From Swiss-Prot:
Pfam family for this entry, one: Hydrolase
Top-rank EC class of the record's enzyme: hydrolase
Consequence of substituting C19 to A/S: Kcat/KM decreases 10-100-fold
Effect caused by changing G47A: Kcat/KM decreases 10000-fold
Impact upon substituting D9A: Loss of enzymatic activity
Source species taxonomy: Bacteria, Bacillati, Bacillota, Bacilli, Bacillales
Effect after changing M46L: Kcat/KM decreases 17000-fold
Cofactor note: Binds 1 Mg(2+) ion per subunit.
Encoding gene (name): phnX
Stated name of the protein: Phosphonoacetaldehyde hydrolase
Organism: Bacillus cereus
Active site: D9, K50
Effect of H53A: Kcat/KM decreases 1000-fold
Record's signal peptide: none
Positions in coiled-coil regions: none
Family: Belongs to the HAD-like hydrolase superfamily. PhnX family.
């Protein structure tokens, strides 16, 4: 079997180490309404279409209970729409600062292309958001062959439609000749639902939620424990393989090809 294409996520996988751009904004739009949410809660739905992310936060029992305490009712769809509009406005202003390629990504992409591998991408950002991120990332040397946003298909993650559209545009089939790489639970589900080899990247991921400085300065035992928690979470949600950094991706690809593995 030959791997012919790799489909990458964006924030937390190829750009924006730790996926911090949306995090503070999600927390802020709730805080403004007197409803405090934690960073851990804000990260949990990461990877979904952003309005679905806001909706998922309002459906978390603790957050819903706190909202009910403040407003004497549960969040309505109008509340969700209002918060999402605020989210977009704030995020658009800061996105250019969070589009730098993660260290090692450009080199891995160049190596994959030398092998004739096509590079696709999916995201939880809207097309308008990605117009900002993709433009800035390209200026810094990262530009996949194709990009699909949830706006381009009937539904975003965990549905497989973005991966299918990548496959069609890149001209690659069957789906087990492709690898999906991401940093969230929804990425793992997207890849598995699409019938692709699915790989979770840990360092720089939203699931780990650490800055580069925090990773460098953290006690090695504590860091290892956190890495293993994320690794297990990825596997429990469908990852065939996990890697700590993007530099390990090619060895995973070679393993798949040499072993003639079958997706299960």
């Amino acid at each position: 079997m030959k791997i012919e294409a790799v489909i990458f996520d964006w924030a937390g996988t190829t750009v924006d180490y730790g996926c911090f751009a949306p995090l503070e904004v999600f927390m802020e739009i709730f805080h403004k309404r007197g409803v405090a949410i934690t960073a851990e809660e804000a990260r949990k739905p990461m990877g979904l279409l952003k309005i679905d992310h806001v909706r998922a936060l309002t459906e978390m029992p603790r957050i819903a209970s706190e909202w009910n305490r403040v407003f004497r009712q549960l969040p309505t769809e109008a509340d969700i729409q209002e918060m999402y509009e605020e989210f977009e406005e704030i995020l658009f202003a800061i996105l250019p600062r969070y589009a730098s390629p993660i260290n090692g990504v450009k080199e891995v992409i160049a190596s994959l292309r030398e092998r004739g591998i096509k590079i696709g991408s999916t995201t939880g950002y809207t097309r308008e958001m990605m117009d900002i991120v993709a433009k800035e990332a390209a200026l810094q040397g990262y530009k996949p062959d194709f990009l699909v946003t949830p706006d381009d298909v009937p539904a975003g993650r965990p549905y497989p439609w973005m991966c299918y559209k990548n496959a069609m545009e890149l001209g690659v089939y069957p789906m087990n000749h492709m690898i999906k790489v991401g940093d969230t639970v929804s990425d793992m589900k997207e890849g598995r639902n699409a019938g692709m080899w699915t790989v979770g990247v840990i360092l720089g991921s939203s699931e780990l939620g650490l800055t580069e400085e925090e990773v460098e300065n953290m006690d090695s035992v504590e860091l290892r424990e956190k890495i293993e928690v994320v690794r297990n979470r990825f596997v429990e949600n469908g990852a065939h393989f996990t890697i700590e950094t993007m530099q390990e991706l090619e060895s995973v690809m070679e393993h798949i090809e040499k072993q003639e593995l079958i997706i299960s």
